[in-house]
């Protein structure tokens, strides 16, 4: 089955956002959640939009396991809004020579592809 989350659609990203979307997500339990992220810093996962950050945070909170999928350019990038502590999700990323990635590996599982 496919479940569609309601709420408002943010036109620039086609993301469902808003209170209705959050309420619906809170009613669900996820075994695994896969999310994109705009930035991964030393301590936090970040995104530029407050409403999208709230959606992502709610999904992470309702998942047994969370995975953040990013390309190497997102490592060390910081966006406006903190989504969650780095420890809250596993990171799936391209192999990177970033020294920051070594620090992140001390805090959470990193899968390099």
Where are these regions (language model features)?
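Conserved phosphate- and dinucleotide-binding cores of soluble alpha/beta proteins
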Residues: 1-113
């Amino acid at each position: 089955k496919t479940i569609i989350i309601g709420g408002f659609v943010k036109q620039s990203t086609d993301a469902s956002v808003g209170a209705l979307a959050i309420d619906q997500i809170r009613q669900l339990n996820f075994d695994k959640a896969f999310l994109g992220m705009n930035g991964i810093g030393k301590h936090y996962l970040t995104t530029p939009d407050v409403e999208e950050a709230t959606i992502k945070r709610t999904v992470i909170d309702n998942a047994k396991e969370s995975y953040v999928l990013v390309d190497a350019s997102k490592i060390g990038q910081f966006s406006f809004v903190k989504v969650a502590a780095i420890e809250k999700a596993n990171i799936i990323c391209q192999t990177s020579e970033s020294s920051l990635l070594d620090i992140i590996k001390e805090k959470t599982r990193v899968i390099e592809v």
